Amino acid sequence: MKNLIIIICLITSSCFAQKTTLYTIGDSTMANKKDPDRNPEHGWAQVLQPFFRENIVVENKAVNGRSTKSFINEKRWDSIYKKLKKGDYVFIEFGHNDQKIEDSARYTNPHTAYRYNLIRFVEQTREKGATPVLLTSIARRNFNEKGVLVPTHGDYPLETRLVAQQYKVPFIDLEYYTEVLEQSYGPEKSKQLHLHFKVGENAFYDKDKADDTHLSLLGATKIAQIVIDAIKKIQDPSVEKLKKAIK
């Protein structure tokens, strides 16, 4: 009888155990896309859930076109902060839109506002007992005429690295890893990682498409796998639970 009670208690506690939420915040390179069965564009965080066991729930809160500034000013961060609980994770990848210097609603100086917005995400995540993880922006497909992949993000990745170092934040250098990915595919084949279509090649588009920033399903899946592999390499006790939940 005693053994039966123990078994019932174990089953009950397992069924009602609180799951860990992995929040992903950032821009269109991460964000969920409408009509995913037809739409060839995918964000890498959109395809992240299948890499984890069911005890990790990915809440992809990345939104097209957002910078750290607009994400905060639109109260998107506030809504996440209110829900954060001890043991959760927040993956933070911004930069693409922070560099939009012609747009006052989005632009941030990498050495001031961008840096302090990242620090805010980190400190407020920790206030809730959750773990922040900083990621640099994914590389754009930007090969020159000699086949050299030219960086496009200015000092934003540098500031992300510096904040991670100074505040001892688990860190994934996604810019570096995706540069390696782009280079491994080369100037022509790397189009497969992005959105390159002629009229009639894809029913979702009614005209030519040549987008070297956003991702195809292949590109998104490759980068999600890169993120998973990078998580495994992080030497920080705070991510052990996440590591153990990888399939």
Where are these regions (language model features)?
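Bacterial Sec-dependent N-terminal signal peptides
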Residues: 1-19
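Serine-esterase "nucleophile elbow" of acetyl-processing enzymes
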Residues: 15-62, 78-88
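Glycine-centered flexibility sites
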Residues: 26, 43, 62-65, 95, ...
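Flexible, active-site-adjacent loop/turn segments at secondary-structure boundaries
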Residues: 28, 42, 69, 154, ...
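Short, flexible micro-motifs
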Residues: 29, 46, 65-68, 90, ...
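Acidic/histidine-rich helix-loop elements
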Residues: 31-41, 62-71, 100-110
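Alpha-helical cap/lid subdomain in secreted, periplasmic
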Residues: 75-221, 225-246
